[in-house]
Regions:
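Terminal, non-globular segments
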Residues: 19-498
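Short, Lys/Arg-rich, polar N-terminal cytosolic tail immediately upstream
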Residues: 1-19
Length: 498
Protein backbone atom coordinates (compact mmCIF):
# COMPACT_ATOMS: atom_id res chain seq x y z
CA UNK A 1 0.00 0.00 0.00
CA UNK A 2 2.91 2.34 0.63
CA UNK A 3 5.52 1.09 -1.82
CA UNK A 4 6.58 2.93 -4.91
CA UNK A 5 5.14 6.33 -4.04
CA UNK A 6 5.73 8.47 -7.12
CA UNK A 7 5.71 12.24 -7.57
CA UNK A 8 2.82 13.88 -9.37
CA UNK A 9 4.54 16.48 -11.52
CA UNK A 10 1.36 17.11 -13.46
CA UNK A 11 -0.13 18.84 -10.43
CA UNK A 12 2.91 21.03 -9.75
CA UNK A 13 4.06 18.88 -6.82
CA UNK A 14 7.50 19.87 -5.62
CA UNK A 15 9.84 16.86 -5.54
CA UNK A 16 11.43 15.90 -2.24
CA UNK A 17 15.08 15.24 -1.54
CA UNK A 18 14.74 11.71 -0.12
CA UNK A 19 15.10 8.63 -2.33
CA UNK A 20 11.82 6.90 -3.09
CA UNK A 21 12.82 3.76 -1.18
CA UNK A 22 13.48 5.67 2.04
CA UNK A 23 10.29 7.69 1.62
CA UNK A 24 8.23 4.53 1.14
CA UNK A 25 9.93 2.92 4.16
CA UNK A 26 9.02 5.88 6.38
CA UNK A 27 5.39 5.69 5.29
CA UNK A 28 5.41 1.93 5.89
CA UNK A 29 6.74 2.39 9.43
CA UNK A 30 4.20 5.14 10.09
CA UNK A 31 1.40 2.89 8.90
CA UNK A 32 2.64 0.01 11.08
CA UNK A 33 2.82 2.26 14.15
CA UNK A 34 -0.69 3.54 13.46
CA UNK A 35 -1.98 -0.04 13.29
CA UNK A 36 -0.17 -0.96 16.51
CA UNK A 37 -2.45 1.38 18.45
CA UNK A 38 -5.30 -1.05 17.80
CA UNK A 39 -3.63 -3.79 19.82
CA UNK A 40 -3.09 -1.96 23.12
CA UNK A 41 -6.18 -3.61 24.64
CA UNK A 42 -6.45 -6.66 22.38
CA UNK A 43 -6.70 -8.95 25.44
CA UNK A 44 -9.27 -6.88 27.31
CA UNK A 45 -12.24 -8.76 28.80
CA UNK A 46 -15.58 -8.43 27.06
CA UNK A 47 -17.72 -5.47 28.03
CA UNK A 48 -21.52 -5.37 28.21
CA UNK A 49 -22.36 -4.91 24.52
CA UNK A 50 -19.85 -7.56 23.49
CA UNK A 51 -21.54 -10.06 25.77
CA UNK A 52 -24.79 -9.14 24.01
CA UNK A 53 -23.10 -10.32 20.80
CA UNK A 54 -22.33 -13.63 22.50
CA UNK A 55 -25.92 -13.94 23.74
CA UNK A 56 -27.23 -13.45 20.21
CA UNK A 57 -25.18 -16.34 18.78
CA UNK A 58 -25.53 -18.79 21.67
CA UNK A 59 -28.39 -20.65 20.01
CA UNK A 60 -26.62 -20.99 16.68
CA UNK A 61 -28.41 -20.25 13.42
CA UNK A 62 -31.86 -20.92 14.91
CA UNK A 63 -31.15 -18.68 17.88
CA UNK A 64 -29.94 -15.84 15.68
CA UNK A 65 -33.05 -15.95 13.53
CA UNK A 66 -35.36 -16.10 16.56
CA UNK A 67 -33.76 -12.99 18.10
CA UNK A 68 -33.95 -10.66 15.08
CA UNK A 69 -36.19 -8.25 16.99
CA UNK A 70 -33.24 -7.41 19.22
CA UNK A 71 -31.71 -4.13 17.99
CA UNK A 72 -28.69 -5.75 16.43
CA UNK A 73 -27.38 -7.07 13.10
CA UNK A 74 -28.33 -10.66 12.18
CA UNK A 75 -25.75 -10.62 9.36
CA UNK A 76 -23.01 -9.86 11.87
CA UNK A 77 -24.30 -12.47 14.30
CA UNK A 78 -24.08 -15.09 11.55
CA UNK A 79 -20.52 -14.06 10.70
CA UNK A 80 -19.50 -14.10 14.37
CA UNK A 81 -21.12 -17.49 14.92
CA UNK A 82 -19.22 -18.97 11.95
CA UNK A 83 -16.00 -17.43 13.27
CA UNK A 84 -16.46 -18.98 16.72
CA UNK A 85 -17.08 -22.38 15.14
CA UNK A 86 -13.67 -22.21 13.47
CA UNK A 87 -11.56 -20.12 15.87
CA UNK A 88 -13.26 -20.66 19.24
CA UNK A 89 -14.66 -18.18 21.74
CA UNK A 90 -11.52 -16.96 23.48
CA UNK A 91 -11.40 -13.22 24.10
CA UNK A 92 -8.32 -12.72 21.92
CA UNK A 93 -9.72 -14.59 18.91
CA UNK A 94 -13.07 -12.84 19.27
CA UNK A 95 -11.29 -9.51 18.96
CA UNK A 96 -9.32 -10.69 15.93
CA UNK A 97 -12.68 -11.26 14.24
CA UNK A 98 -13.04 -7.46 14.19
CA UNK A 99 -9.40 -6.63 13.45
CA UNK A 100 -9.47 -8.43 10.09
CA UNK A 101 -12.47 -6.61 8.56
CA UNK A 102 -11.13 -3.31 9.87
CA UNK A 103 -7.83 -3.97 8.10
CA UNK A 104 -9.79 -4.56 4.91
CA UNK A 105 -11.68 -1.32 5.56
CA UNK A 106 -8.37 0.57 5.76
CA UNK A 107 -7.29 -0.85 2.41
CA UNK A 108 -10.56 0.09 0.73
CA UNK A 109 -10.36 3.63 2.09
CA UNK A 110 -6.81 3.86 0.73
CA UNK A 111 -8.04 2.68 -2.66
CA UNK A 112 -10.80 5.30 -2.66
CA UNK A 113 -8.38 8.03 -1.58
CA UNK A 114 -5.91 6.93 -4.26
CA UNK A 115 -8.59 7.58 -6.89
CA UNK A 116 -8.93 11.13 -5.55
CA UNK A 117 -5.44 12.17 -4.46
CA UNK A 118 -1.73 11.49 -4.91
CA UNK A 119 -0.51 8.21 -3.48
CA UNK A 120 1.24 9.73 -0.48
CA UNK A 121 -1.93 11.65 0.40
CA UNK A 122 -3.94 8.44 0.12
CA UNK A 123 -1.57 6.76 2.57
CA UNK A 124 -1.92 9.68 4.99
CA UNK A 125 -5.72 9.52 4.76
CA UNK A 126 -5.58 5.80 5.60
CA UNK A 127 -3.28 6.51 8.55
CA UNK A 128 -5.63 9.22 9.87
CA UNK A 129 -8.44 6.68 9.65
CA UNK A 130 -6.38 4.14 11.63
CA UNK A 131 -5.47 6.68 14.32
CA UNK A 132 -8.98 7.94 14.98
CA UNK A 133 -9.96 6.91 18.54
CA UNK A 134 -13.31 5.62 17.29
CA UNK A 135 -11.55 3.27 14.86
CA UNK A 136 -9.03 2.18 17.50
CA UNK A 137 -11.97 1.16 19.69
CA UNK A 138 -14.03 -0.48 16.94
CA UNK A 139 -11.08 -2.42 15.51
CA UNK A 140 -11.09 -4.80 18.49
CA UNK A 141 -14.71 -4.46 19.57
CA UNK A 142 -16.73 -7.67 19.26
CA UNK A 143 -19.62 -5.82 17.67
CA UNK A 144 -20.73 -5.11 14.06
CA UNK A 145 -18.81 -1.84 13.71
CA UNK A 146 -15.67 -3.18 12.01
CA UNK A 147 -17.81 -4.87 9.37
CA UNK A 148 -19.88 -1.70 9.06
CA UNK A 149 -16.69 0.29 8.44
CA UNK A 150 -15.70 -2.25 5.79
CA UNK A 151 -19.03 -1.89 3.99
CA UNK A 152 -19.00 1.92 4.28
CA UNK A 153 -15.54 2.14 2.72
CA UNK A 154 -16.51 -0.37 0.02
CA UNK A 155 -19.52 1.83 -0.78
CA UNK A 156 -17.33 4.94 -0.95
CA UNK A 157 -14.87 3.21 -3.29
CA UNK A 158 -17.72 2.05 -5.53
CA UNK A 159 -19.13 5.58 -5.59
CA UNK A 160 -15.75 7.01 -6.57
CA UNK A 161 -15.35 4.44 -9.34
CA UNK A 162 -18.84 5.23 -10.63
CA UNK A 163 -17.80 8.80 -11.48
CA UNK A 164 -16.44 7.78 -14.87
CA UNK A 165 -18.14 4.42 -15.24
CA UNK A 166 -21.40 3.58 -17.02
CA UNK A 167 -21.63 -0.01 -15.75
CA UNK A 168 -25.02 -1.27 -14.63
CA UNK A 169 -23.31 -3.89 -12.48
CA UNK A 170 -21.31 -1.27 -10.60
CA UNK A 171 -24.50 0.72 -9.98
CA UNK A 172 -26.18 -2.43 -8.66
CA UNK A 173 -23.19 -3.06 -6.38
CA UNK A 174 -23.44 0.51 -5.10
CA UNK A 175 -27.10 0.01 -4.19
CA UNK A 176 -26.41 -3.32 -2.49
CA UNK A 177 -23.50 -1.97 -0.44
CA UNK A 178 -25.48 1.11 0.62
CA UNK A 179 -28.25 -1.16 1.95
CA UNK A 180 -25.67 -3.36 3.67
CA UNK A 181 -24.47 -0.37 5.68
CA UNK A 182 -27.89 -0.17 7.31
CA UNK A 183 -27.95 -3.93 7.80
CA UNK A 184 -24.91 -3.74 10.07
CA UNK A 185 -26.12 -0.67 11.99
CA UNK A 186 -29.50 0.99 11.51
CA UNK A 187 -28.25 4.39 12.64
CA UNK A 188 -25.63 4.38 9.91
CA UNK A 189 -28.45 5.24 7.52
CA UNK A 190 -27.35 8.79 8.34
CA UNK A 191 -24.71 8.47 5.61
CA UNK A 192 -27.24 7.63 2.87
CA UNK A 193 -28.17 11.26 2.04
CA UNK A 194 -24.48 12.09 1.51
CA UNK A 195 -24.01 9.07 -0.76
CA UNK A 196 -27.12 9.97 -2.76
CA UNK A 197 -26.11 13.61 -3.23
CA UNK A 198 -22.59 12.69 -4.32
CA UNK A 199 -23.86 10.03 -6.72
CA UNK A 200 -26.27 12.45 -8.40
CA UNK A 201 -23.62 15.19 -8.52
CA UNK A 202 -21.16 12.84 -10.24
CA UNK A 203 -23.64 12.19 -13.08
CA UNK A 204 -25.21 15.62 -13.40
CA UNK A 205 -23.64 16.14 -16.82
CA UNK A 206 -24.95 12.83 -18.20
CA UNK A 207 -28.61 12.59 -17.27
CA UNK A 208 -29.26 9.50 -19.37
CA UNK A 209 -26.64 7.54 -17.44
CA UNK A 210 -27.79 9.15 -14.19
CA UNK A 211 -31.38 7.92 -14.47
CA UNK A 212 -30.38 4.45 -15.65
CA UNK A 213 -27.77 3.86 -12.93
CA UNK A 214 -29.86 5.58 -10.26
CA UNK A 215 -32.85 3.39 -11.09
CA UNK A 216 -30.77 0.23 -10.91
CA UNK A 217 -29.14 1.30 -7.64
CA UNK A 218 -32.52 2.14 -6.07
CA UNK A 219 -34.10 -1.18 -7.09
CA UNK A 220 -31.19 -3.18 -5.69
CA UNK A 221 -31.08 -1.01 -2.56
CA UNK A 222 -34.79 -1.55 -1.93
CA UNK A 223 -34.53 -5.32 -2.30
CA UNK A 224 -31.43 -5.53 -0.11
CA UNK A 225 -33.01 -3.25 2.50
CA UNK A 226 -36.14 -5.37 2.97
CA UNK A 227 -34.65 -7.68 5.68
CA UNK A 228 -33.85 -4.64 7.82
CA UNK A 229 -37.40 -3.23 7.79
CA UNK A 230 -38.74 -5.32 10.75
CA UNK A 231 -35.77 -4.25 12.87
CA UNK A 232 -36.24 -0.65 11.81
CA UNK A 233 -39.93 -0.77 12.75
CA UNK A 234 -39.09 -2.33 16.10
CA UNK A 235 -36.49 0.35 16.82
CA UNK A 236 -38.91 3.14 15.90
CA UNK A 237 -41.68 1.74 18.10
CA UNK A 238 -39.35 1.22 21.08
CA UNK A 239 -36.88 4.06 20.53
CA UNK A 240 -37.31 5.41 24.04
CA UNK A 241 -36.29 2.11 25.64
CA UNK A 242 -32.82 2.12 24.05
CA UNK A 243 -31.63 5.53 25.28
CA UNK A 244 -28.59 5.22 27.52
CA UNK A 245 -26.58 8.44 27.08
CA UNK A 246 -26.95 12.12 27.83
CA UNK A 247 -27.54 14.86 25.27
CA UNK A 248 -24.29 15.59 23.41
CA UNK A 249 -22.11 18.66 23.79
CA UNK A 250 -20.73 20.67 20.89
CA UNK A 251 -17.23 19.78 22.05
CA UNK A 252 -17.91 16.13 21.22
CA UNK A 253 -18.77 17.09 17.65
CA UNK A 254 -15.60 19.15 17.32
CA UNK A 255 -13.48 16.43 18.92
CA UNK A 256 -14.70 13.87 16.39
CA UNK A 257 -13.74 16.04 13.42
CA UNK A 258 -10.41 17.15 14.89
CA UNK A 259 -9.44 13.62 16.03
CA UNK A 260 -9.23 14.75 19.65
CA UNK A 261 -7.10 17.79 18.93
CA UNK A 262 -4.59 16.19 16.57
CA UNK A 263 -5.80 18.72 14.01
CA UNK A 264 -3.38 21.17 15.66
CA UNK A 265 -0.55 19.32 13.92
CA UNK A 266 -2.32 19.69 10.59
CA UNK A 267 -2.87 23.41 11.17
CA UNK A 268 0.80 23.92 12.02
CA UNK A 269 1.96 22.22 8.83
CA UNK A 270 -0.56 24.13 6.72
CA UNK A 271 0.83 27.38 8.15
CA UNK A 272 4.39 26.22 7.48
CA UNK A 273 3.42 25.35 3.91
CA UNK A 274 1.85 28.78 3.48
CA UNK A 275 4.97 30.49 4.85
CA UNK A 276 7.14 28.51 2.44
CA UNK A 277 4.75 29.20 -0.43
CA UNK A 278 4.13 25.47 -0.70
CA UNK A 279 0.39 25.77 -0.16
CA UNK A 280 -1.68 25.46 -3.32
CA UNK A 281 -5.41 25.99 -2.75
CA UNK A 282 -6.30 25.68 -6.40
CA UNK A 283 -8.92 23.03 -6.97
CA UNK A 284 -6.77 20.30 -8.53
CA UNK A 285 -9.06 17.57 -7.19
CA UNK A 286 -12.26 19.02 -8.60
CA UNK A 287 -15.43 20.28 -6.98
CA UNK A 288 -16.93 16.80 -6.78
CA UNK A 289 -14.04 15.56 -4.63
CA UNK A 290 -14.51 18.46 -2.23
CA UNK A 291 -18.25 17.75 -2.10
CA UNK A 292 -17.61 14.05 -1.46
CA UNK A 293 -15.16 14.58 1.40
CA UNK A 294 -17.19 17.24 3.18
CA UNK A 295 -20.53 15.47 2.71
CA UNK A 296 -19.30 12.11 3.98
CA UNK A 297 -17.83 13.77 7.07
CA UNK A 298 -20.47 16.31 8.01
CA UNK A 299 -23.84 14.98 6.82
CA UNK A 300 -23.97 11.81 8.98
CA UNK A 301 -22.32 13.55 11.90
CA UNK A 302 -24.74 16.49 11.87
CA UNK A 303 -27.76 14.19 11.46
CA UNK A 304 -26.79 12.19 14.55
CA UNK A 305 -25.94 15.36 16.47
CA UNK A 306 -29.18 17.10 15.49
CA UNK A 307 -31.24 14.03 16.38
CA UNK A 308 -29.56 13.80 19.77
CA UNK A 309 -29.86 17.50 20.58
CA UNK A 310 -33.37 18.03 19.22
CA UNK A 311 -35.04 14.89 20.60
CA UNK A 312 -34.86 12.55 23.58
CA UNK A 313 -33.15 9.95 21.39
CA UNK A 314 -29.51 10.52 22.30
CA UNK A 315 -27.42 8.54 19.80
CA UNK A 316 -24.32 10.72 19.50
CA UNK A 317 -22.11 8.12 21.17
CA UNK A 318 -18.61 7.43 19.79
CA UNK A 319 -19.33 4.08 18.16
CA UNK A 320 -22.26 5.52 16.19
CA UNK A 321 -20.07 8.41 15.04
CA UNK A 322 -17.90 5.86 13.24
CA UNK A 323 -20.13 6.40 10.20
CA UNK A 324 -18.45 9.78 9.64
CA UNK A 325 -14.82 8.75 10.23
CA UNK A 326 -14.06 7.71 6.61
CA UNK A 327 -15.27 11.12 5.45
CA UNK A 328 -13.22 12.84 8.14
CA UNK A 329 -10.10 10.96 7.02
CA UNK A 330 -10.76 11.99 3.42
CA UNK A 331 -11.19 15.62 4.53
CA UNK A 332 -7.81 15.48 6.20
CA UNK A 333 -6.41 14.03 2.98
CA UNK A 334 -7.99 16.89 1.03
CA UNK A 335 -6.23 19.47 3.21
CA UNK A 336 -2.91 17.61 3.00
CA UNK A 337 -3.23 17.58 -0.79
CA UNK A 338 -3.02 21.38 -0.72
CA UNK A 339 0.60 21.06 0.43
CA UNK A 340 2.50 20.74 -2.82
CA UNK A 341 5.70 19.74 -1.04
CA UNK A 342 6.19 16.01 -0.70
CA UNK A 343 8.69 16.58 2.10
CA UNK A 344 6.15 18.55 4.14
CA UNK A 345 3.59 15.81 3.62
CA UNK A 346 6.05 13.21 4.84
CA UNK A 347 7.04 15.28 7.86
CA UNK A 348 3.38 15.89 8.71
CA UNK A 349 2.66 12.16 8.55
CA UNK A 350 5.64 11.36 10.78
CA UNK A 351 4.72 14.05 13.32
CA UNK A 352 1.08 12.96 13.39
CA UNK A 353 1.93 9.31 14.00
CA UNK A 354 4.54 10.07 16.67
CA UNK A 355 2.22 12.35 18.65
CA UNK A 356 -0.79 10.06 18.28
CA UNK A 357 1.21 6.98 19.26
CA UNK A 358 2.60 8.72 22.34
CA UNK A 359 -0.92 9.66 23.40
CA UNK A 360 -2.32 6.19 22.75
CA UNK A 361 0.44 4.31 24.56
CA UNK A 362 0.55 6.62 27.59
CA UNK A 363 -3.01 7.90 28.14
CA UNK A 364 -5.07 5.86 30.59
CA UNK A 365 -8.17 6.11 28.41
CA UNK A 366 -6.51 3.97 25.73
CA UNK A 367 -5.54 1.27 28.24
CA UNK A 368 -9.12 0.36 29.06
CA UNK A 369 -11.45 -0.87 26.35
CA UNK A 370 -14.64 -0.58 28.41
CA UNK A 371 -15.79 -1.68 31.84
CA UNK A 372 -16.38 -5.41 32.21
CA UNK A 373 -18.36 -7.65 34.53
CA UNK A 374 -15.71 -10.38 34.30
CA UNK A 375 -13.90 -9.83 37.60
CA UNK A 376 -17.07 -9.11 39.56
CA UNK A 377 -18.76 -12.28 38.30
CA UNK A 378 -15.65 -14.36 38.97
CA UNK A 379 -15.58 -13.05 42.54
CA UNK A 380 -19.31 -13.67 43.00
CA UNK A 381 -18.99 -17.23 41.68
CA UNK A 382 -16.17 -18.02 44.10
CA UNK A 383 -17.97 -16.45 47.06
CA UNK A 384 -21.50 -17.73 46.41
CA UNK A 385 -20.61 -21.26 45.29
CA UNK A 386 -19.53 -22.15 48.84
CA UNK A 387 -23.15 -22.41 50.00
CA UNK A 388 -24.97 -21.98 46.67
CA UNK A 389 -26.05 -18.50 47.71
CA UNK A 390 -28.30 -16.77 45.15
CA UNK A 391 -27.06 -13.64 43.39
CA UNK A 392 -29.35 -10.68 42.72
CA UNK A 393 -28.08 -8.74 39.69
CA UNK A 394 -29.23 -5.36 38.42
CA UNK A 395 -29.41 -5.59 34.65
CA UNK A 396 -27.12 -3.18 32.82
CA UNK A 397 -29.22 -2.84 29.66
CA UNK A 398 -31.67 0.10 29.42
CA UNK A 399 -34.36 -2.16 27.94
CA UNK A 400 -34.63 -3.90 31.34
CA UNK A 401 -36.38 -0.82 32.74
CA UNK A 402 -39.35 -1.58 30.48
CA UNK A 403 -39.65 -5.32 31.19
CA UNK A 404 -41.28 -7.50 33.79
CA UNK A 405 -38.51 -9.44 35.46
CA UNK A 406 -38.27 -13.03 34.18
CA UNK A 407 -37.74 -16.01 36.46
CA UNK A 408 -36.23 -19.45 36.02
CA UNK A 409 -35.17 -20.47 32.52
CA UNK A 410 -36.68 -17.28 31.09
CA UNK A 411 -33.81 -15.27 32.59
CA UNK A 412 -31.36 -16.85 30.18
CA UNK A 413 -33.74 -16.80 27.22
CA UNK A 414 -34.57 -13.08 27.47
CA UNK A 415 -30.92 -12.03 27.64
CA UNK A 416 -31.67 -9.55 30.40
CA UNK A 417 -28.26 -10.35 31.94
CA UNK A 418 -25.95 -10.50 28.88
CA UNK A 419 -22.65 -10.89 30.80
CA UNK A 420 -23.84 -14.31 31.99
CA UNK A 421 -23.86 -15.46 28.36
CA UNK A 422 -20.05 -15.45 28.44
CA UNK A 423 -18.98 -15.23 32.10
CA UNK A 424 -20.99 -17.98 33.76
CA UNK A 425 -22.45 -18.31 37.24
CA UNK A 426 -23.37 -21.76 38.57
CA UNK A 427 -25.42 -20.42 41.49
CA UNK A 428 -29.08 -19.26 41.36
CA UNK A 429 -29.55 -15.83 39.76
CA UNK A 430 -32.35 -13.26 39.89
CA UNK A 431 -32.50 -10.04 37.81
CA UNK A 432 -33.62 -6.52 38.61
CA UNK A 433 -34.15 -3.53 36.28
CA UNK A 434 -31.37 -1.05 35.63
CA UNK A 435 -32.95 1.81 37.57
CA UNK A 436 -34.98 1.96 40.76
CA UNK A 437 -38.59 1.84 39.56
CA UNK A 438 -41.84 0.09 40.47
CA UNK A 439 -40.75 -3.19 38.91
CA UNK A 440 -37.49 -3.02 40.85
CA UNK A 441 -39.36 -2.62 44.12
CA UNK A 442 -41.84 -5.38 43.27
CA UNK A 443 -39.24 -7.93 42.16
CA UNK A 444 -36.78 -6.90 44.87
CA UNK A 445 -39.35 -7.16 47.66
CA UNK A 446 -40.40 -10.61 46.46
CA UNK A 447 -36.78 -11.74 46.37
CA UNK A 448 -36.17 -10.47 49.92
CA UNK A 449 -39.20 -12.38 51.19
CA UNK A 450 -37.97 -15.58 49.57
CA UNK A 451 -34.45 -15.16 50.97
CA UNK A 452 -35.43 -13.87 54.42
CA UNK A 453 -33.34 -16.51 56.21
CA UNK A 454 -30.64 -17.09 53.60
CA UNK A 455 -27.37 -15.43 52.66
CA UNK A 456 -27.26 -13.84 49.22
CA UNK A 457 -25.21 -11.42 47.11
CA UNK A 458 -26.33 -8.37 45.15
CA UNK A 459 -24.43 -6.82 42.23
CA UNK A 460 -24.85 -3.62 40.23
CA UNK A 461 -22.96 -1.23 37.98
CA UNK A 462 -22.77 2.50 38.72
CA UNK A 463 -26.16 3.39 37.23
CA UNK A 464 -27.83 0.91 39.59
CA UNK A 465 -26.12 1.85 42.85
CA UNK A 466 -29.37 3.45 43.99
CA UNK A 467 -31.03 0.04 43.83
CA UNK A 468 -28.32 -1.43 46.06
CA UNK A 469 -28.94 1.34 48.60
CA UNK A 470 -32.66 0.57 48.54
CA UNK A 471 -31.98 -3.15 48.99
CA UNK A 472 -29.72 -2.48 51.96
CA UNK A 473 -32.44 -0.43 53.66
CA UNK A 474 -35.24 -2.84 52.77
CA UNK A 475 -33.29 -5.82 54.12
CA UNK A 476 -31.95 -3.99 57.16
CA UNK A 477 -34.28 -5.74 59.60
CA UNK A 478 -33.45 -9.27 58.45
CA UNK A 479 -29.88 -9.07 57.07
CA UNK A 480 -26.54 -7.52 57.85
CA UNK A 481 -25.05 -5.90 54.75
CA UNK A 482 -21.33 -5.95 53.85
CA UNK A 483 -19.67 -4.40 50.81
CA UNK A 484 -17.32 -7.05 49.43
CA UNK A 485 -15.71 -4.89 46.77
CA UNK A 486 -16.03 -2.87 43.59
CA UNK A 487 -14.70 -4.48 40.42
CA UNK A 488 -14.40 -2.18 37.40
CA UNK A 489 -17.41 -0.22 38.61
CA UNK A 490 -19.49 -3.28 39.55
CA UNK A 491 -20.26 -3.24 43.28
CA UNK A 492 -20.84 -6.50 45.15
CA UNK A 493 -22.78 -6.58 48.44
CA UNK A 494 -23.24 -9.51 50.81
CA UNK A 495 -26.48 -9.93 52.77
CA UNK A 496 -26.10 -12.19 55.83
CA UNK A 497 -29.16 -13.21 57.94
CA UNK A 498 -29.14 -11.72 61.43
Amino acid sequence: MVSGIQPEASQGLRPGGLPEGIRAAIYAVAFAVALSTWFIEIRAPLWLDETVSMFLIKGGWAGIMSRQVWPDAPAYSCLLWLWTKVMGTGEFMLRISSVLPMLAAVYLLYRAARELFDQDVAVIAAIVFCLHPIIIFAAIDVRPYAFAALVINATILTLVLLRHNHSNWLAALFGFLAASIVEFQLLFAAILPALAVCFIASKIGDRKTLWRQLGIALVVFTLAFLPAIPRLQYMMHTSGTHVFSEAPRLLQLVSTITVRGLVIILVVFVLVAAARRSLDLRNHEGQWTVLLCISLALVPLLILYGLSVGTSIHVFVPRYRLVAVPGIALCWGLVVSWMNSRTLRLLFCAALVVVAACVCFTAASFHRHMYSWKDALAFAEKNASVDNAPVLICSDIPEADHMRMPVGAAIEETGILPPLSYYKLTVPVAPLPRTLNEETIRAGSMFLQQQAERRFLAMAFVESYGTLDWLAKAAGASHTVHELGVFDGVKVLEFVPR
